[in-house]
């Protein structure tokens, strides 16, 4: 079981490294992406500076200017996302084929024992293609997904491909609180 775990971690690291290499070739080294990233950084810093200077004001003209700056920033972010999505689609197709190949190698084998009893909707993933009723048995796909998520995120930080904190703060997320709330946490 330990050998399988180490092999899966190596596979996850190798596929994450290959994915980041392909992304670098297709996206990060292009002049268009570099221009978009520099523009995004510049607009983000400018917006943060304006927000700090203005603070909480009731002037509608200043608020409109800030809203326009935020819209420009969102448009640049959207352009960057569209540029990256094209290569991510190709990488996704390639890794889906690799995943099915690796999944067939480890089919029916317990690769690890989970130290917890997984909740219902995760059991389908953690116990996929395994024989038996012990839900603490871990399948290849579950361990691979966990390792890939962890390795890829850290690899992006190490290689410098992860967005800066200021840019990440500006990117819209359905779970992120609105900018006007919780400013005291920043």
From Swiss-Prot:
Gene Ontology terms, MF aspect: calcium channel activity
Main localization category: endoplasmic reticulum
Protein's UniProt keywords contain Magnesium: no
Residues exposed to the Cytoplasmic side: 1-6, 109-134, 152-186
Compartment list: Endoplasmic reticulum membrane
Keyword set, alphabetical order: Calcium, Calcium channel, Calcium transport, Coiled coil, Endoplasmic reticulum, Ion channel, Ion transport, Membrane, Transmembrane, Transmembrane helix, Transport
Lumenal face of the membrane: 28-87
Oligomeric form and interacting partners: Homodimer and homotetramer.
UniProt name for this protein: Calcium load-activated calcium channel homolog
